[in-house]
């Protein structure tokens, strides 16, 4: 994948989040997830929230919509995925029938679930009960 990395890009395996300067309001950066599907994320630090107990970090406080399923074909593939979900008579419905998860809800997002993953992945930091 080395040849796919754009000029001026930094390999995420070589940088730590704290090195990105995310403590500054207005900080922007791009993140390319999944070279095959080319999910390009533009991230903007809109605000900083104070946290009384630093042990509650990292913490997800809000988000919009569910992440697209893995290997969904990038933006174009995900658009087809959504169209097929909405219209069972869609021309691509038969091709996608075995791939679609009937329980997937593109409108859902569970910050509590994300925080449980953070707890598991980042050492089980203590959280306030209302955010756990």
Label for each model-derived stretch:
Residues 1-132:
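Short linear regulatory motifs enriched in tryptophan with gly/pro/ser
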């Amino acid at each position: 994948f080395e040849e796919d990395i754009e000029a001026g890009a930094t390999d995420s395996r070589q940088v730590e989040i704290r090195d990105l300067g995310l403590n500054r309001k207005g900080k922007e950066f791009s993140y390319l997830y999944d070279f095959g599907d080319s999910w390009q994320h533009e991230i903007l630090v809109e605000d900083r929230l104070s946290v009384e107990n630093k042990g509650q970090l990292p913490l997800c406080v809000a988000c919009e919509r569910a992440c697209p399923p893995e290997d969904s074909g990038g933006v174009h593939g995900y658009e087809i995925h959504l169209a097929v979900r909405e219209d069972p008579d869609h021309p691509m419905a038969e091709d996608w029938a075995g791939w679609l998860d009937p329980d997937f809800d593109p409108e859902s997002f569970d910050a509590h679930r994300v925080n449980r993953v953070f707890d598991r992945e980042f050492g089980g930091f203590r959280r306030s009960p209302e955010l756990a």
